[in-house]
């Protein structure tokens, strides 16, 4: 597809906008990934290496921006925006999305939100709050620059508005513009993954918006929502944030489920094993995933009954998730199981890494274990296996499987693609697998220094990060 000079601001075609979402995703994701390479360069050995002692807040600023960019500006625009915009009307038999101009506006809001978040680095101390923006650190006028927190909040608000507009667009398209005779019961798994994701966004994003606006008013308008000195409660913000933050994980991964299901089904010319159960499993994941946000807060002093409920419900999510994994494997086994295309290989890698990441999530879901492993590198290893490896491989699978549609070129049989896949996979495994052992050795996250005894594992992690960088250069 040829994109002319002004098509970014004048085009309302869903395919063109989907391609722009993908380009923005890779552009923003490259920036976020390079920030993570800086972090791993700092952590390749104990003591401070490339960050000066008097400027150690730079480390906090880097991992804050890295987290926000990779979640809100890499995975979401790529999988939800790119895959959704390009394929949802096609899968519904609709000529176009319901509101093409609103779709165009939501795309144009993405770079604006990205620039706002990046501007926080230009403030005096930067926004070193972590991507969670916890008070009282984010509301303190003494330890940080409030301007940095302001622009991060505005960036998240703009990104949230764009996501809500896309969600309304997708749901309206499916409900009112699908082809005649195409009932909801026979829609594909990919379509349902986008519908459920849109519903979760509409449910949870207003709560995040309310939470960050309360932060903003605490900073500038003398409210005391989160100030315990005046009967405020910083734990309230954690509830508001994680009510969005945990469903956000499923918002990121559900479109990847749709992509993987579509790729496995089409590459092997097989119907998905248990097609309806796959849709039901995604619905169960969405409902249960919205009811377990407190498992991020086991160390905040919860009652025993509360911890028991959230532990059991968290572990319960493994049932529908396991259903999906077994159905994918059964679909593979009903075929000749050959690696027909690179997208088939990437799909298999996704299943392996997502299963491993989900298994460590079941371990962390146990309140007694999580108290010991909370805020250690075990947590980082867990969610990077699901997101950094799982969702990102889902994004690359999208590009690999549909490159004919996107670019009019077919590189599936190119050996460089297989080389890139293996180099990237080995790199990310080397990066994140040793972090489990660092977590068991109680290495705290968000700290740029650590004991000399942990040098070996950290060196392996940094080597893996460098391998991943070379793999991505090959992909480019």
UniProtKB/Swiss-Prot annotation:
Q: Where does Ca(2+) bind?
A: 42, 448
**Residues that, per the record, bind heme a3:** 382
**Entry's transmembrane regions:** 19-39, 61-81, 105-125, 151-171, 194-214, 240-260, 278-298, 310-330, 345-365, 379-399, 415-435, 455-475
Q: Which keywords has UniProt assigned to this entry?
A: Calcium, Copper, Electron transport, Heme, Iron, Magnesium, Membrane, Metal-binding, Mitochondrion, Mitochondrion inner membrane, Respiratory chain, Translocase, Transmembrane, Transmembrane helix, Transport
What InterPro entries does its record include? Cyt_c_oxase-like_su1_dom, Cyt_c_oxase-like_su1_sf, Cyt_C_Oxase_1, Cyt_c_Oxase_su1_BS
KW Transport (keyword) present: yes
Record: residues binding Mg(2+)? 374-375
This protein's membrane topology, according to the annotation, is: Multi-pass membrane protein
Question: For binding Cu cation, which residues are annotated in this chain's numbering?
Answer: 246, 295-296
Name by which UniProt lists this protein:
Cytochrome c oxidase subunit 1
Q: Which gene encodes it?
A: MT-CO1
């Amino acid at each position: 597809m040829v994109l002319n000079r002004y098509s970014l601001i004048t085009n309302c075609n869903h395919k063109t906008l989907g391609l722009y979402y993908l380009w923005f995703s890779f552009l923003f994701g490259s920036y976020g990934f390079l920030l993570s390479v800086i972090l791993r360069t700092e952590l390749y050995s104990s003591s401070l290496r490339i960050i000066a002692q008097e400027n150690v807040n730079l480390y906090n600023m880097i991992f804050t921006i890295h987290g926000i960019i990779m979640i809100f500006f890499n995975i979401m625009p790529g999988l939800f925006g790119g895959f959704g915009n390009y394929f949802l009307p096609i899968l519904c038999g609709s000529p176009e999305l319901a509101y093409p101009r609103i779709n165009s506006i939501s795309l144009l809001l993405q770079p604006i939100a990205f620039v706002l978040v990046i501007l926080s680095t230009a403030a005096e101390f930067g926004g070193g709050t972590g991507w969670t923006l916890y008070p009282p650190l984010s509301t303190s006028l003494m330890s940080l620059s409030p301007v940095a927190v302001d622009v991060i909040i505005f960036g998240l608000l703009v990104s949230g508005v764009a996501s809500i507009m896309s969600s309304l667009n997708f749901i309206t398209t499916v409900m009112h513009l699908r082809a005649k005779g195409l009932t909801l019961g026979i829609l594909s798994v990919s379509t349902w993954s986008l519908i459920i994701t849109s519903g979760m966004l509409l449910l949870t994003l207003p709560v995040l918006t309310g939470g960050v606006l309360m932060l903003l008013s605490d900073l500038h308008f003398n409210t005391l929502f989160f100030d315990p000195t005046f009967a405020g409660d910083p734990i309230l913000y954690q509830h508001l944030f994680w009510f969005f933050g945990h469903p956000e994980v499923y918002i990121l991964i559900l479109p990847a489920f749709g992509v993987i299901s579509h790729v496995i089904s089409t590459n092997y010319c097989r119907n998905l094993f248990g097609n309806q159960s796959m849709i039901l499993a995604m619905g169960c994941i969405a409902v249960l995933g919205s009811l377990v946000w407190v498992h991020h807060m086991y160390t905040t002093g919860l009652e025993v009954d509360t911890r028991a409920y959230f532990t059991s419900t968290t572990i319960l999510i493994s049932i529908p998730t396991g259903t999906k994994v077994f159905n994918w494997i059964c679909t593979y086994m009903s075929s000749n199981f050959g690696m027909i295309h690179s997208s088939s290989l990437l799909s298999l890698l996704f299943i392996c890494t997502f299963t491993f990441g989900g298994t460590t999530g079941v371990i962390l879901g146990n309140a007694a274990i999580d108290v010991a492993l909370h805020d250690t590198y075990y947590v980082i290893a867990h969610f990077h296996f699901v997101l950094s490896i799982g969702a990102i491989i889902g994004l690359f699978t999208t590009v690999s499987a549909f490159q004919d549609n996107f670019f009019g070129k077919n590189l599936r049989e190119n050996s460089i693609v297989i080389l890139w896949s293996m180099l990237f996979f080995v790199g990310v495994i080397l990066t994140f697998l040793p972090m489990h052992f660092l977590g068991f050795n109680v290495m705290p996250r968000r700290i740029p220094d650590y004991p000399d005894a942990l040098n070996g594992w950290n060196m392996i992690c940094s080597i893996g990060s460098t391998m991943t960088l070379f793999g991505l250069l090959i992909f480019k």
